[in-house]
Each structure stands twice: as C-alpha cells, then as structure tokens.
Amino acid sequence: MANANGKAATSLPEKISAKANPEADDATEIAGNIVYHAKYSPHFSPLKFGPEQALYATAESLRDRLIQLWNETYVHFNKVDPKQTYYLSMEYLQGRALTNAIGNLNLQGPYADALRTLGYELEEIAEQEKDAALGNGGLGRLASCFLDSMATLNLPAWGYGLRYRHGLFKQIITKKGQEEIPEDWLEKFSPWEIVRHDVVFPVRFFGKVQVNPDGSRKWVDGDVVQALAYDVPIPGYGTKNTISLRLWEAKARAEDLDLFQFNEGEYELAAQLHSRAQQICTVLYPGDATENGKLLRLKQQFFLCSASLQDIISRFHERSTTEGSRKWSEFPSKVAVQMNDTHPTLAIPELMRLLMDDNGLGWDEAWDVTSKTVAYTNHTVLPEALEKWSQSLMWKLLPRHMEIIEEIDKRFVQTIRDTRVDLEDKISSLSILDNNPQKPVVRMANLCVVSSHTVNGVAQLHSDILKAELFADYVSIWPNKFQNKTNGITPRRWLRFCSPELSDIITKWLKTDKWITDLDLLTGLRQFADNEELQSEWASAKTANKKRLAQYIERVTGVSIDPTSLFDIQVKRIHEYKRQLMNILGVVYRFKKLKEMKPEERKKTVPRTVMIGGKAFATYTNAKRIVKLVNDVGDVVNSDPEVNEYLKVVFVPNYNVTVAEMLIPGSELSQHISTAGMEASGTSNMKFALNGCLIIGTLDGANVEIREEVGEENFFLFGATADQVPRLRKEREDGLFKPDPRFEEAKQFVKSGVFGSYDYGPLLDSLEGNTGFGRGDYFLVGYDFPSYMDAQAKVDEAYKDRKGWLKMSILSTAGSGKFSSDRTIAQYAKEIWNIEACPVP
C-alpha cells in the first residue's frame, strides 16, 4: 500500500498528533485517535505502522467508542431495571467486526478519510481482520444476527457463549481432500474483547452429593475451575444501545498447581488441573467418538450454563431497588433465559441447584421459578442432533444434576399417570430418562420440553413437523407451549454492508434508507421491477459484485472464472441431507453432455460457474468424500479445453462469514436442495434471496415461506414434499424405486475413473440398494434427481432472457422483507420473553 507520496505506509505521519478521544466522529479526530493507539497501546514495535498495526489501532479507536456506549447502556439498564433476556448459545459466528461496527455507528466516511490520511484504504485494513472462530454454521450465525437485532431494537438482552481459542477448524484443501488445522484467530489477540477480571465464577465437575443433617443436599469435592468473562460489545444500528456478548474462558486457580510435584519434576501431574481447565475452551465441538470426547463436550455445555446463570443471578441481586435481597418469585419477571438448541439444556438442573442448594428454596418454589424463566428453541428434527447423554457419564460428571433430573422426570411421569391415562403407553417415549438397560440415556430435548414455558421451531414447516410428529404427545398435554418463530437475518451485514452498490440503488428507488431497519419497505421495489432504468442499475451492481467475486476466487483457488457466466452457488455445512452430492452429480451429468456435444451445440448452452463451499465434520467420512469429489470434478472440468469455456467447478475453501459476504452479493442462482422435512429453516437462503439471487430448492425449511413471499414464478421448485418422504422411503425398501437414466449415467461416469483414481464406491454405495446401514439412498437423491435436472434446465432457459431474469431478481429482493431478524426478535420479545425496548437516552 502506498501513501500520497507513493511510498509504502510503514510509519506514522508526524503531522498527525496522537490524541485519545472516544467520541471522535470527524476524520481528523479519528486519525488522531488511531495514532494514539498505535503509539500508546503497545502491542507492536513503535517503529512500524504496517497494515496489521493499522488494523489493531483502528479497532481500538472504535472499541473506545463502543466501551463508552456499552457503559451508558449498562448503567441505563441498571437504573431502569427492565426484564432482560439472556441468550445461551454454544456457537456465535460473528464475522469481521470492524466494518460492522463502523457501519452500525454510521462512521464509514470519516473512518475511510482518516485512514487515507494515514496512508491506507479502509477496505485494505478491514481485510487484515480474522473472523472470530466461535461457531460453525447456521446455528452460530443466527445467534449473531439475533444479537445485532436485539441491540438495534434497543432490547435489554445479552448473549452468553464460550471463548474458543481454535474454533471448529480451518479447512484446507489438498490432493487428499479436506484437511483440518486449528483456527488461529487469537494467535495475537482480539482487539474487540474486554477481559473482566472482576467477573469470575467457580464451576465444579465430578465430586459427590453431601446430605446435611437437615436433609438439604450439597455438591462437594471434585474439580473446580474458574470462569473468567470476556465481553465483546455489540452495537445496534443507528442507536446508542450497545449490548454484550459475554464469552467465558476456563482457568485453574494458582493454588491448583502442585508446587511439590512440580519441583520433583512431575510437571504434567503437578499442572493437571490447569491442563484440564485449558481443554474446555480449546475447540468447538471436540470429537465425541471417545468417552473423553463426550466428557469434554458435556463439560463445555455445563461450563457455559453454570457460569452464565451465576452471572445472571448476580445481576438480578445487583439491580435490586429494595433494601436487602429480592424475592425469588420476582426472578421470572426480571429474567428470561433462551436456550439456543439443546446444548444449554443443563441450565435447567443448574438453575434448580443454584436456587435450592445455594439459596435455600424448596423444590416447588425452585421449579416454579425455573419453569417460568427458561424457553427452548428447537433447530432440528435429525435424530442424531437431538442430544442424548449417557446416564453413567452424567452421574460421573454432574451427580447433583442427575438427582435433580431424576426428580423432574419422576414428577412429570406421575403427573401423566394422574391426569392422562390415555398416554400411559407413551410414557417410555415421553419421559426424560430412557432407562433401556443396554444404553440408559438422558434425552435433552425431552428435558427442555418438559421444563420450558415455551418451545419454538424456526420455520412454519419445521414447527408444524415438531407439533405433528416429534413432540405430538407433548402438544396434547401443553397445546399453548409450542410456537413458530421463523428465522431471520440482519439486513445490515447481509445487504447494507456487504453489497453497498445494491443498497444505494434500493435507497435511491425507495427514496429512503429506512428499509435498513424496516425491511418490509422493500416491497416498494415491486412496482419498479419492469423499469428498464432500475434493471440497468441492478445489472451493473450485480456485475460489479460478480467481478469482485471472480477476483477473489482466482486469488484463493487459482481458478479463473468468467464473470459473464451464470454464478451458481451452494454454500453450507457439508451433510448428506443438504445434498451437495446431488448438486455435483448434476454437474457431472452436465459435463458429460457438454463433452458429447459438437462445438456449435456448446455455443448455444448457458455458460455456468458452479461454486460449492462448506466444512465437513472431521469424523464425517461421507461428507469428506463429497468435498473430495467436488474438487476432483473441478480439476478435470476446469482443465478440459473443450468444456471449460462453458462450465467451471470451484470448491471454495474455509467457508465462513467473510467468505459468505463475498459470495452472496455475486450470486445469481443459489441451491437449497435438502431432502424435504429435514432442514429446520436455513438462513443462507434468506441472505441469497435478499441479494436478488434466485433459488432452486425443495419445499423445505424457510424455502416454503421464501417462495410464498417472492412469488412461485420466481423460485425454481423441484422434489418430493415432506409428507411424501416416508412413503417414498418405504417404497424404496420394498424395491419399487426405478432410477432415472440420467442419474445412472452420472454415477457410472464417476465410477469410470474419469475424475481420478480415488475410490468413490463407498460414497456412491449410499445411493444403491434398498435397505441396510449407509445404503438405500435415505436422502432421496435418486428420487429427486430427475425433477432437479428438469428445474436446472428451466434455470438455463430463464437466464437467456436477461430482462426476465433481472425482473425476477428484483422481485426476490422485494419479497425478502419478512426475513429480517428484526422481525424475528421483535416476535420473541413480545410472545416469548415478554420484554420491552429500553433505549439509552
């Protein structure tokens, strides 16, 4: 990077004086604040001011502002003492914070100008920031969108999570396929987090239950680690309100180091508690194939719940306006705890334990408080994702909590027997404890449903399936407990900041930028969908985004792609139910047909660039085989001189929020092709639709509602419906399935070895046969393949009509208003949490 004199900007300009000013909002003052941090926040040698130093100094100048706003918000919440929501999630997928904070504070211009005076462009400095590795997929990104909306809507709410040092993993692609290496986002430090040395809570593991003479019970002995709080400020858009994502780190105490053993040379033994504490926040979702892996995952979940609840209770007392401590009966009127999936389920027995054992409440009072405080969001109908923990493991790690869970279960079962004789034969499936002697487990979803005041699904279809199938008997007991809250995304990060050209066009045609916080205003674009001037501007914004994406793809993968081709993208966690395998088999068939065509025929086809990205869990063999297949197909297709003008295939490595912010604005077709009934909602479909990308998809998750909103004619639909899936699986078992010739042709082409010597037999075998483990095409790739290929042919035809395609694209954006996380969170606030806005004056 060169400064105005054409020299590399490696030192600070002497003419700008260093001055700390958290309230700086013009370019000169901001530049002074950046220089101040470069000089006096001594993370680096003072002799340099390279791009990395510029990032940290810029971030810290912003952090000053955020801390001031955070303090004002905290003081205001303490003064008003509103009911507050606490959002518990094992994952947050924040993405880069710099551009988001600058955008939410509306300081893009001043910061860009300030950095120019220091010899840098804002975009270049933003590129230096690493994504916080606190999540993996949609669950974590949803939590982050929700925090943005909570702050923007001025709601009294906080997030709680864990400070993972190495995240899930960083994905690298080699000749072997996907390989995993640790994330390094904290290798230096994060400029956004504020360590709170005064916020430390003890968290116990193992031990035993001590029965006191008065009959009360106490959990004692075992290991005790310290939970230390790190706060990440979350600014709202266009408001002073700045809330907190509080992340916990596990530490051992100084006295837990055995100096005698250490001085005897027994270093590992002397520091074993320090080592065990450090393991808790090392990675997200440690492998759980071993007993130790399961134990570590359970430790993570309990650590999050215990530290967060102790903090929540501390704040409940801190805000007391009366003399002495508050009445516990007030707790549910001041505290709402939302469990994001089943990972934080241990909040239920832990809150019971804290109330009874530490604060002397009786069972009935503690249960009344707990069951009025906690609510549960279900995110899946996949059996493997409905957590079940071994009872023996739970007794070992959390003996007091198992006693409490047993008592909850006993009382629930007794209530059923007393009030619902008709459900007697369902008790074994309704109960929290599955006491099967072969494998006794605790069913966490059942514990959530029994104990929560509200249970919600995350899309209308998903919620309907929960009520009709998964939780049907519970619905007959508590019909009013179940709700739907269709997921949403923040329009700030997913349109305003990631596609500024398109946002400016929207603002120009709507004659207001209020759509950024009131996304329903996008419907105003419908009246202009046929307007040639808008279509021309829309196309130029799309082209700019496609060119930017093409440059990124070449830089990261070395593959040169044509920005005039149709950009077809599928990015999400690699899983068989999400059916990336169907996508790549469709590509294989397209490649084979292109190879068979004469050159004149090829010229009549629609050139297409297919991009696939996402991480496969390290132990999920078939998912990793799919990643390998995509890369092998890409290697062959992209180097084929006859075809590569008309088809390119790219695997985009290490998919994360920042990569998504590059891919989504440049997309034209996006694939959301899960087996119907298996995707709870999905949120990437909303991000693509908001950016004017057309969707090819099944009637699954939020696709159903997106299609309703954007118009059936603007959605490429295919595939079986959720209610047909069980019958189709049964027919497959009975040998009644007849595969489409195109499907067989694609599979045989892969088996022929044209894409290399790797043995794809085990992967393709999952699509063969009628029954058996890992066989029988459980996800209906074969059944849906012909309608998928027909829908892809319709895509090609539609893309040839440029005006028609642009109209569909505009209508896609115009129909995306419903899918703002502001709408979702406003519904949670009103219908589940019963909280109100608390704006900082």
Swiss-Prot record:
Its EC number is 2.4.1.1. It is an enzyme of class 2 (transferase). It is found in: Cytoplasm. Keywords: Allosteric enzyme, Carbohydrate metabolism, Cytoplasm, Glycosyltransferase, Pyridoxal phosphate, Transferase. GO terms for molecular function: 1,4-alpha-oligoglucan phosphorylase activity; glycogen phosphorylase activity; pyridoxal phosphate binding. One of its GO terms (cellular component) is cytosol. It comes from the Eukaryota. It catalyses: [(1->4)-alpha-D-glucosyl](n) + phosphate = [(1->4)-alpha-D-glucosyl](n-1) + alpha-D-glucose 1-phosphate. The modification N6-(pyridoxal phosphate)lysine is found at K687. Disulfide bonds: none annotated. Its cofactor is pyridoxal 5'-phosphate. GO terms for biological process: carbohydrate metabolic process; response to water deprivation. Residues 1-24 are annotated as: Disordered. Belongs to the glycogen phosphorylase family. Phosphorylase is an important allosteric enzyme in carbohydrate metabolism. Enzymes from different sources differ in their regulatory mechanisms and in their natural substrates. However, all known phosphorylases share catalytic and structural properties. This is Alpha-glucan phosphorylase 2, cytosolic. The gene is PHS2.
